[in-house]
């Protein structure tokens, strides 16, 4: 008779892994035990079916569980007469992998809809297959006493389920019921409304066109009826958010199919237990008010992921709600009841609960480009799942702090990187405070208590750079600056385990190694270094950030043609006087920086075509340009010129203006401009790949959320015999910069 020890690592805590092992061993008549050893689960087996156990183990895992490594060894038999689950210990001191928050499972959903079930209409129903994890944990090991559920002692019925190995709630730390768990209440301003069904009250008020703040699993949403134009506009007014698209939540997939196009991969993602927001194209039956996603051809959509969401739909007759984060753009979501109840200037009512959110976590956002997944924001449902470093690196610990906007941080230990949830814009003090708190929380969860280096952006004035030096003093370690687009590139390279490549890096801004503003770059990169090979033509930015907010100023600078710009005089607040002042500013060089940003060029095209002349949110002008281009019916050729590896964008923009003033179709010009820029950058990349003897060309940066630009680069590069890669597990935008920083820093520590 055989005897073996099996050690498994991965997402094996708080996911029903030990009960699964228990059931599998019992099914195969095996004796022994299973127990947690910190970051490892140990399985001791005796019997004749051990090989069958090993074969079935990874194939029948619980929904949330994931095995990253499994080691087996023969051991001496001890003569066990049963199989048991024994008490955990901290024998291993490695990093425990805590699972992310997972959408309610079918079994729990069935219970809250069954009038005969004791959890009927209970909005916090959960089991080992679903529910909150990351948002409720304070420290490891993952036991109820170290979560926000510790405030809710189990009743006798729940305790019985908790202690039964064959029950799906066995050691489910988030389980509860209406007798022992959290409760919901509804308020109008500071006054509680007495009701035994506060969710029904909320559904009724939403039907009346009211705005409701709803505290959820990882934060708070502001919610209105998505079909109610008046309510949507009122929400915009109160938030001072005039144009940025609102995400929506629909009750089921059939509802989504009524207004959006869905591919098989999009369906699989939007219905997965991670339940991200997926950016979908509007279909011909789209019938929401224009105020919901103004000027865009797509809309962010998610399905319900908590019991409360399902109950909200069940109690009303609206199939789609606006669900937008209750925060100022770039600042952290509100998570405390005190904050939420002080929203009475924005929300009419507040639906809150008494379970603490220990780790706030925004909704994840995903966009597909021809069935290739791209994270816009990797957060709820994914954080804190780690990334593997696909290179030979040391075992030193690195904390990487990201750039300044759309920040995440990352902690690297051994060959793994533990990314944070979405943090936001650290030029806001509240967000910087949240970041510091989140770092402390992640240190407790991962048990990474010290760092050998702190990685950050090269920009000397970023708050994250200053924070890096604070941590450097605390841990008595070095600060390693990593160039912005190099970090982008290595995050992409790690997706594929590629050692070297040519990279097209396109975004709004990144601090260059020459202290200029980069953003349209052709780089040769490896994991330790990079070389700048080419870029977009550099242009002056009159007024610095003013040129970002008002892209008509950038257009003036790029085309540098008084006759062409004169047609746009009405877009300048002070008319011809302002135009003359800007030209004078460009001549003197006062408050004028140079940029090679692709984002600024696309914004200028948008301004030239009178699509968007004032930016009210990040990426607005470029996104609206893409949406206008989406409806193009005819191909227009715009010639481009490359000299010394620099793409001449002045002539491209001048041609855009000429075509528009000749009366060519706006959508066709927009489409042509995007594709011309993509072809020009691809041509520079191809020529340099040939010189360097490199056969892989990658695309990174926020511009590559643009489907037309990405597809054009891919087609052009592959037609020329090179391999084209794009982000598949990481953000194309700034959300992955910390990941790249961490990898570069670890290699430099070698």
Where would I find each of the regions flagged by the language model?
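Intrinsically disordered, low-complexity, mixed-charge
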Residues: 1-174, 178, 185
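Internal gly/pro-rich beta-alpha loop/helix module
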Residues: 60, 161, 316-392, 590, ...
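A phosphate-binding glycine/aspartate-rich beta-alpha loop in the early core of alpha/beta enzymes
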Residues: 74, 219-282
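A contiguous, well-structured pocket-lining segment that forms one wall/lid of small-molecule binding clefts
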Residues: 173-174, 181-183, 403-441, 466, ...
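Short glycine-rich phosphate-binding loop at a beta-alpha junction
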Residues: 213, 448-461, 692-703
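Conserved phosphate-binding catalytic cores of ATP/NTP-utilizing and phosphoryl-transfer enzymes
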Residues: 257-262, 311, 333-340, 364, ...
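Conserved phosphate-binding/catalytic loops in two-lobed NTP-binding clefts
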Residues: 457, 475-488, 695-700, 707, ...
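Glycine-rich phosphate-binding/hydrolytic loop that grips phosphoryl groups
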Residues: 485-506, 510-512, 550-560, 603, ...
């Amino acid at each position: 008779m055989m005897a073996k020890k099996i050690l498994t690592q991965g997402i094996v805590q708080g996911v029903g892994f030990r009960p699964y092992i228990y059931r599998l061993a019992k099914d195969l008549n095996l004796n022994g035990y299973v127990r947690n050893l910190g970051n490892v689960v140990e399985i001791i087996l005796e019997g004749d079916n051990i090989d069958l156990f090993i074969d079935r183990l990874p194939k029948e895992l619980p929904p949330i569980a994931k095995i990253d490594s499994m080691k087996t060894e023969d051991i001496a038999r001890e003569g066990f007469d049963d199989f048991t689950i024994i008490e955990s210990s901290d024998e291993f001191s490695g990093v425990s992998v805590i699972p992310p928050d997972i959408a309610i499972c079918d079994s729990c959903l069935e219970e809250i809809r069954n009038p005969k079930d004791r959890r009927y209409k209970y909005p916090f129903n959960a089991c080992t297959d679903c529910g909150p994890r990351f948002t409720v944990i304070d420290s490891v090991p993952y036991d109820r006493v170290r979560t926000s559920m510790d405030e809710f002692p189990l009743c006798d019925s729940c305790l019985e389920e908790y202690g039964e190995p064959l029950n799906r709630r066995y050691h489910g730390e988030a389980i509860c019921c209406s007798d022992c768990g959290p409760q919901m209440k509804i308020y109008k301003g500071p006054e509680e409304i007495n009701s035994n069904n506060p969710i029904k009250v909320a559904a009724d008020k939403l039907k009346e066109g009211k705005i409701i703040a709803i505290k959820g699993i990882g934060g708070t949403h502001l919610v209105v009826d998505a079909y109610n134009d008046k309510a949507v506009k009122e929400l915009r007014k109160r938030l001072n958010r005039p144009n940025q698209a609102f995400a929506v939540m629909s009750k089921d997939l059939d509802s989504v199919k009524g207004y959006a196009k869905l591919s098989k991969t999009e369906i699989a993602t939007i219905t997965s237990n991670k339940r991200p927001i997926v950016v979908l194209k509007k279909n011909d039956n789209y019938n929401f008010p224009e105020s919901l996603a103004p000027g865009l051809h797509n809309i962010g959509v998610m399905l319900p992921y908590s019991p409360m969401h399902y109950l909200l739909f069940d109690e009303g007759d609206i199939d789609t709600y606006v669900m937008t984060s209750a925060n100022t753009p770039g600042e952290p979501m509100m998570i405390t009841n005190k904050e939420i109840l002080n929203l009475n200037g924005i929300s009419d009512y507040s639906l809150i609960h008494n379970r603490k959110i220990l780790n706030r976590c925004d909704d994840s956002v995903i966009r597909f480009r021809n069935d290739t997944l791209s994270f816009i924001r990797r957060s709820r449902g994914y954080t804190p799942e780690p990334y593997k470093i696909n290179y030979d690196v040391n075992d030193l610990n690195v904390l990487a702090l990201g750039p300044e906007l759309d920040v995440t941080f990352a902690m690297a230990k051994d060959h793994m990187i533990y990314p944070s949830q979405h943090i936001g814009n650290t030029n806001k003090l509240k967000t910087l405070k949240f970041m510091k708190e989140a770092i402390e929380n992640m240190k407790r969860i991962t048990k990474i208590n010290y760092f050998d280096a702190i990685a950050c952006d090269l920009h000397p004035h970023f708050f994250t750079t200053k924070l890096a030096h604070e941590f450097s003093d605390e841990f008595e370690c070095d600060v390693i600056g990593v160039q912005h687009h190099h970090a982008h590139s290595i995050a992409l390279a790690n997706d594929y385990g590629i050692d070297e490549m040519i990279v097209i890096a396109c975004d709004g801004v990144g601090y260059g190694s020459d202290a200029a503003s980069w953003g349209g770059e052709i780089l040769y990169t490896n994991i330790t270094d990079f070389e700048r090979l080419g870029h977009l033509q550099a242009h002056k930015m009159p007024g610095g950030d003013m040129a970002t907010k008002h892209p008509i100023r950038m257009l003036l600078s790029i085309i540098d043609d008084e006759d062409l710009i004169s047609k746009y005089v009405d877009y300048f607040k002070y008319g011809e006087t302002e135009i003359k002042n800007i030209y004078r500013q460009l001549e003197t060089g006062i408050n004028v920086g140079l940029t090679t940003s692709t984002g600024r060029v696309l914004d200028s095209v948008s301004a030239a075509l009178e699509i968007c002349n004032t930016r009210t949110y990040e990426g607005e002008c470029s996104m609206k340009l893409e949406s206008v281009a989406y409806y193009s019916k005819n191909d227009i050729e715009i010639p481009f010129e490359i000299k010394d590896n620099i793409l001449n964008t002045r002539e491209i923009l001048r041609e855009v203006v000429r075509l528009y003033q000749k009366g060519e179709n706006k959508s066709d010009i927009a489409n042509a401009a995007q594709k011309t820029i993509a072809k020009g950058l691809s041509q520079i990349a191809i020529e340099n790949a040939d010189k360097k003897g490199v056969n892989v060309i990658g695309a990174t940066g926020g511009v590559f959320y643009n489907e037309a630009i990405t597809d054009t680069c891919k087609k052009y590069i592959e037609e020329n015999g090179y391999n084209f890669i794009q982000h598949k597990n990481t953000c194309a935008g700034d959300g992955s910069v910390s990941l790249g920083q961490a990898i570069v820093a670890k290699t430099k520590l070698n």
